Amino acid sequence: MCNRARPNPNNDAVYSLSINSDTHVMKPESATLAAISVGAPTFSQEAVSRAIEAQFGLIGEYSPLVSERDQNFMLRADDGGHFVAKVTSGLEEAAATDFQVEALLHLEVKGGLNVPRAVRTKAGETFGEISDDNGSYRLRVVTWVDGEPLESQGLNERSVCNFGAALARLDKAFAGYTHPGENPALLWDLQRVLELRELIDYISDSSARKSVTQAADDFENRVLPVLGDLRYQVIHSDANPGNILLADDRIGFIDFGDIVKAPLVFDVAIAMSYLRSFDANPLKFMVPFVAAYHAVNPLDAREADVLFDLVRARLTTTITLLYWRLSARAENDAYRQKALEVESGAGRFLAILDSIGRSEFREKLAFIQ
């Protein structure tokens, strides 16, 4: 039973970040890096509104939303409906976009989950289209999910228990879903963490750079050899507190743009990497979260054995891309600013995990055998 606890204000601890003065913007050398370097499309609100009205039949008030790759708007329709309109990144493969839409349709059939629903065009299609001088872009609409982001409310034992159980139900619903586009080229995919080694030099803080290097080495030496022993399925892959919505005790999930087929335990580790406590008990949110997940969708010992290195690998991804983004995107870039605000505690928490060590971490999860 999860007892309500007072939110810990220290969860929002931030430390300053800077980049070396001689750091230059990296020219993308791979599809994965290019996908997050170019920013979202930049259609005018009026152009999107016209396209949505013509193809989806929705009219209303638009407000821009911050996004890494897609151009998103909140749409309050005149008929009372509440939606998100999405102009998909021009670098995203059509198969990857279809994978995301079909995933939402799959979850809708499963039922019982608080997730967006795909809205079809007037012609019954799952995509529309919007064009400019640079070409055509896929246009989507999904329903709005009510609730406040977990990141804005502070963590407590009750909320993380609800989060863990809800993520377990989501993963169970995803089991059995397959699609030709289930392996998109995304640097946020934890399976690609070793590709980030080429960006580690962007980390100007020597202590953080050392921790990230060690975490990447540990992933290579401890996780890669056992990946074949783990359960694979489609996972959300980005269950961070900004994508987790809380309305009373009901959990909602948004942003399915990073879904991928990967080891199931990756979904647990990714979520854990954001359940940070900076007081005397750094794991006080992680352990009840895992226990709640395990009660609904049991993990096995092999999965629990790699959680320490997987959490550190996700923090490595977060830290490396944060420092790289400082140089790769303009200072007034909205996603860059949001990432700085939300993620600047990742390096500090990675150092805390390093001090705890693999053995003590695993002992805290001894209920998984």
Tell me what each language-model feature is.
Residues 24-58:
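Juxta-kinase regulatory segment immediately upstream of eukaryotic protein kinase catalytic domains
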Residues 41-54, 176-180, 194-237, 298:
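An alpha-helical support segment within catalytic cores of ATP-dependent transferases
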Residues 57-73:
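ATP-binding glycine-rich phosphate-binding loop
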Residues 68-80, 84-85, 118, 220-266, ...:
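Active-site acidic catalytic loop and adjacent metal/ATP-binding pocket
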Residues 78-178:
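ATP-binding pocket architecture of kinase catalytic cores
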Residues 150-208, 232:
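A cross-family kinase active-site recognition segment
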Residues 202, 320-369:
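ATP/Mg2+ or Mg2+-diphosphate-binding catalytic cores
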Residues 265-298, 312-330:
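Active-site activation/catalytic loop segments of kinase-like enzymes and analogous catalytic loops
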